[in-house]
Design a protein with these regions (language model features):
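Outer-membrane beta-barrel transmembrane strands
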Residues: 252-301, 338-383, 416-447, 493-511, ...
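Structural signature of Gram-negative outer-membrane beta-barrels, strongest in the C-terminal barrel
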Residues: 350, 367-377, 382-386, 390-573, ...
Length: 766
């Protein structure tokens, strides 16, 4: 999990919702009735291969993606969504579930991508999708389905991704090498009232992009802008060292081992899904889905920490950095800067069994639904961490690993000292939920629902206490069986928890006239920490996590305009996090639990002013602030690093967001479209010391239905060719506003905007 604060508050939107609220909560067979519109969920400025993360003014959490009504993965660390799911030809439907629907059916807060696998249809049907870009991406997706006679149907799918990324790295030709296979067999029975489907899926993925694109150097000017560091091009120059080998100390055994970064990020999944639906004579509909998955999940991070200026007067004579040249000869490093990085090798063996069943029935003026979840998750997980140093080349060449000969004779050091993790055991959630969508009168629609959930954790972790009852924390060469300086032996610690969680949601829409009305909704969720929260060296705050979300406003619809404007409030208590605070070359972990609250106002409009032209506009103002955000840590030299961010704007979340999405049908077969997203100023550290100016994310393209069976497309990502940094700045958590005033034109590292990219797509139906 490695809850590095600078990677977890990924930022975007308070409440990107609100279109066609009057139809928001119908619970019929049409999946769109439970979904949002106009979200462009697959237009992702952060990634070329996954769904866009739509935030709601809270810290980033698990991305909710459902396939056939079940989560694609129970927990996204260490098994990320993109390694086992893609928006490819294997899917018959993709949408975005509303916040209330996600809360009631899954117990999570936020939007969820809702997808369904393509089942067999009568006759023979095929879809072949192809995608490429000017960097060399080759992506293929194939679905073939048909009938076998006597109400038997089949569907087979293949997905292949060969993505070199936007810059070349030495360790592998691909930053994403993913293959996914699916096979389905369906039987309709009892005069097609019932349908049973068995599906097998296998996925194999190396998500190199997760660490290859994690950071890059730039010059922070001091006014919210950045400029390039020498010839280093943000987004098109690699910042990874040439060497692909990694030495680590196994958290479980204590033995030194070697791997490659490519092998360390191998993800594999083998899963079986059974689906059944049945329509009874009395109008009652029943569906049930069961999935078992056995997998290896892995996430690799190469997190930047301190940058040392060797030319600084304060550092003169302190360091003696060396490197090995292409012939293996040891030579003195004469560059100006050295970057310290923390390598985190996260991996776990996972077994999960997820079962969901629902009954629903339509009445004259309402629809009633009753559902049950039984979700079981077992994992054996650890994160092995290693520190190393590398060069920071200004000429755009590949970085090399270096070591300080005054301290050590090799590249790697401080094994498992920082952010190493371990937990093993199971998490089980048993939940019962219901929803009722009721047209009380012709003018008033009422939707309400509730969920009651029993959450049980049982297993072990490495949050070890000494004889005085204090957590030992991590130290160099930490592992199970190691001995701390005070004589405490590191041994697994048993843990067991039982919690009652609950959610409820209510929404009302009142039509004052045929075109104008009022709308509002309120969702309240009570959760407790997930198993992954027990991975660090200390126990998390196990108090309840409460998330209230309320919205109220107006809507107006006519023949050419649909407009909604709402005020929103959302908050969340007891966010568990671990800050890896840095002082000089030392890193200390500081766990804390804090609250967040966000007020906001959103206006969303969809207009069709003339034939062929559509325009979507969204404006959001929000003010997300920290509450109860205080922590401190004492470093080895006696320095006490303190943070009090209470009242500060949440890092990485903008206060103003704008979306502009015009499109025009040039002919009945050719569509031109663009999408503009504006993100205002964001703070790049917790203390509001560093910040990045606002920026636009832009997309544009043309779609051509060349024939009945062939469609072609061209998309340009970042067509304004904006370059720059975003997110947070590595190692900057303790920097204050007063200190930052004097920091100008200084080299730093962080994440960056996706570079200008031209993509080509083709889809053939046969």
């Amino acid at each position: 999990m490695n809850t590095l604060f600078n990677g977890k508050l990924a930022a975007m939107v308070l409440a990107l919702s609100m279109v066609n609220i009057s139809a928001a909560y119908a619970q019929d067979e049409n999946a769109n009735a439970k979904e949002e519109g106009n979200r462009n969920v697959m237009l992702n400025a952060a990634s070329a291969n996954g769904p866009r993360e739509i935030q709601i003014g809270l810290p980033s959490a698990d991305v909710n993606v459902l396939e056939n009504g079940l989560p694609v993965t129970y927990a996204t660390n260490p098994h990320s969504v993109n390694t086992i799911w893609r928006g490819d030809a294997s899917l018959s439907h993709q949408g975005l579930l509303k916040i209330a629907e996600t809360a009631i059916t899954t117990g999570n807060i936020g939007y969820a991508v809702n997808s369904f696998t393509q089942k067999g249809q009568k006759g023979f049907n095929g879809t072949l999708n192809y995608k490429s870009n000017h960097f060399g991406l080759q992506e293929f997706s194939l679905n073939m389905n048909g009938d076998l006679g006597k109400d038997w149907f089949y569907s087979v799918n293949m997905y292949q991704d060969f993505d070199p990324g936007t810059f070349k790295i030495k360790s592998t030709p691909y930053q994403d090498r993913t293959q996914i296979y699916k096979a389905l067999l369906t039987k309709k029975y009892n005069n097609e009232r019932g349908e049973f489907t068995a599906m097998y899926k296998y996925a194999n993925s190396h998500n190199v992009y997760n660490y290859a694109t994690q950071s890059a150097p730039f010059i922070y000017v001091g006014d919210g802008s950045v400029k390039e560091y020498g010839k280093f091009k943000l987004g098109t120059t690699s910042y990874l060292p040439i060497d692909n080998e990694m030495t680590y100390r196994d958290m479980r055994t204590g033995k030194l081992a070697q791997t490659t970064l490519y092998d360390a990020c191998l993800n594999k999944a083998s899963e079986v899904t059974l689906m059944n639906s049945y329509r009874f004579d009395n109008g009652l509909n029943w569906k049930a889905t069961l999935k078992y998955d056995h997998s290896r999940g892995a996430m690799v991070y190469q997190t930047p920490m301190a940058i040392v200026d060797l030319n600084s007067a304060d550092n003169h004579g302190l360091y003696n950095y060396m490197y090995r040249d292409i012939d293996g000869q040891t030579k003195a490093y004469n560059g100006q800067y050295v970057q310290t990085r923390m390598s985190c090798l996260n991996a776990g063996t996972i077994d999960e069994a997820l079962f969901t069943t629902e009954l629903n029935k339509k009445f004259k003026t309402s629809t009633l639904r009753l559902g049950l979840n039984e979700w079981f998750y077992h994992i054996d997980y650890c994160s092995n961490t290693t520190m190393y140093d590398q060069s920071v080349p200004a000429d755009g060449s590949y970085a090399v690993r270096v070591w300080d000969a005054n301290l050590r004779s090799g590249y790697f050091y401080d094994f498992n000292k920082n952010a190493s993790e371990y937990y093993k055991g199971s998490e089980n959630k048993l939940a019962l939920y219901f929803t009722h969508d009721w047209d009380v009168t012709k003018k008033l629609n009422l939707y309400y629902g509730a969920r009651v959930e029993w959450q049980r954790l049982k297993g072990e972790n490495a949050a070890v206490k000494n004889a005085q009852g204090n957590f030992v924390g991590r130290f160099a060469y930490y592992h199970l069986g190691a001995m701390a300086a005070d004589g405490t032996k590191i041994a697994p610690v048993d843990l067991a928890y039982n919690w009652l969680n609950y959610d409820f949601s209510v929404a009302a829409t009142y039509k004052l006239t045929d075109n104008f009305g009022f709308t509002g909704d309120f969702t309240y969720i009570v959760q407790h920490p997930k198993f992954e929260a027990f991975a660090p060296a200390t126990l998390p705050n196990t108090d309840k996590i409460s998330v209230p979300l309320g919205r109220a406003g107006i809507y107006y619809n006519n023949s050419w305009l649909s407009l909604t404007s709402l005020f929103s409030y959302i908050s969340k208590t007891n966010n568990n996090s671990t800050l890896n605070l840095q002082h000089g070359s030392e890193i200390k972990a500081a766990p804390l639990a804090y609250d967040i609250q966000t007020w906001g106002w959103t206006t969303d409009a969809v207009a069709h002013p003339f034939k062929g032209f559509d325009f979507h506009f969204l404006f959001t103002y929000q003010k997300p602030t920290y509450k109860k955000f205080e922590t401190s840590v004492t470093f080895n030299d006696g320095y006490v690093g303190k943070i009090n961010a209470t009242g500060n704007i949440v890092a990485e979340i903008p206060e103003i967001l704008i979306e502009l999405d015009p499109s025009y049908m040039v002919t009945k077969d050719i569509k031109l479209w663009t999408s503009f997203r504006y993100f205002s100023k964001t703070y790049a550290n917790i203390n509001e010391a560093y910040y990045f100016n606002g920026h636009w994310e832009t997309f544009g393209g043309v779609n051509w239905q060349a024939s009945k069976r062939l469609s072609l497309g061209c998309t340009v990502v970042n067509f304004l060719n904006q370059t720059g940094a975003k997110g947070s700045i590595a190692g900057a958590e303790l920097i204050t506003k007063d200190e930052a005033k004097n920091i100008k034109n200084q080299i730093m590292t962080g994440s960056y905007l996706r570079p200008f990219t031209v993509e080509f797509t083709a889809s053939l139906k046969f």
